[in-house]
């Protein structure tokens, strides 16, 4: 009686991780192949390409620093928030101040906040 593909899958599903690793090693030896070669042959660089193509950034305040009042002023200027909301955002760091910014606008806002004494990231 021949084993079906489903029987093999069920048998592998019941194995421990160590047993599966041993099975893979035995198959590599039997058929003269390497499991690592299959990984290399797969499509690669998908995440790197996406990172290069990113056009919208989020401005994230990671820390207000020593000069919190100056940072609040710049946050109000960049976001258009009122004093109370800007203070809450600065006190609640890390906080996303603005989403979907262009690279140029994000860099400009980041520079202003860093000059005011804040720590900022563009994500």
UniProtKB/Swiss-Prot annotation:
- Gene Ontology, cellular component aspect: cytosolic large ribosomal subunit
The answer to keyword Transmembrane helix applying to this record is no
In terms of SUPFAM superfamilies, this protein maps to: ClpS-like (SSF54736), Ribosomal protein L7/12, oligomerisation (N-terminal) domain (SSF48300)
Point out residues bearing the modification N6-methyllysine.
84
CDD domains xrefs: Ribosomal_L7_L12
GO molecular-function terms, A-Z: mRNA binding; structural constituent of ribosome
- Kindly state which keywords UniProt assigns to this record, in alphabetical order: Methylation, Ribonucleoprotein, Ribosomal protein
Superkingdom, taxonomy of origin: Bacteria
What Gene Ontology terms for biological process does this UniProt record contain? translation
Residue ranges with Basic and acidic residues bias: 100-115
- Report residue spans for region: Disordered: 94-123
Q: Which Pfam families match?
A: Ribosomal_L12 (PF00542), Ribosomal_L12_N (PF16320)
| Protein's UniProt keywords contain Cell membrane | no
Instruction: Give the protein's function.
Output: Seems to be the binding site for several of the factors involved in protein synthesis and appears to be essential for accurate translation. Forms part of the ribosomal stalk which helps the ribosome interact with GTP-bound translation factors. Is thus essential for accurate translation.
Task: Give the family, as the similarity comment puts it.
Answer: Belongs to the bacterial ribosomal protein bL12 family.
Assembly notes? Homodimer. Part of the ribosomal stalk of the 50S ribosomal subunit. Forms a multimeric L10(L12)X complex, where L10 forms an elongated spine to which 2 to 4 L12 dimers bind in a sequential fashion. Binds GTP-bound translation factors.
What protein is this chain from?
Large ribosomal subunit protein bL12
Native species of this protein? Answer: Halophilic eubacterium NRCC 41227
**According to the entry, what is the taxonomic lineage of the organism?**
Bacteria
Q: Which gene encodes it?
A: rplL
């Amino acid at each position: 009686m021949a084993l079906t593909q489903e029987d093999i899958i069920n048998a592998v599903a019941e194995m421990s991780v160590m047993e599966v690793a041993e099975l893979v090693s035995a198959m590599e030896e039997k058929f003269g192949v390497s499991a690592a070669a299959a990984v290399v042959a797969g499509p690669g660089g998908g995440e790197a390409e996406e990172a290069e193509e990113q056009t919208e950034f989020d401005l994230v305040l990671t820390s207000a620093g020593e000069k919190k009042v100056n940072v609040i002023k710049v946050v109000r200027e960049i976001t258009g928030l009122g004093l109370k909301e800007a203070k809450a955002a600065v006190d609640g760091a890390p906080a996303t101040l603005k989403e979907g910014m262009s690279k140029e606008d994000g860099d400009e806002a980041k520079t202003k906040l860093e000059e005011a004494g804040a720590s900022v990231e563009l994500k």
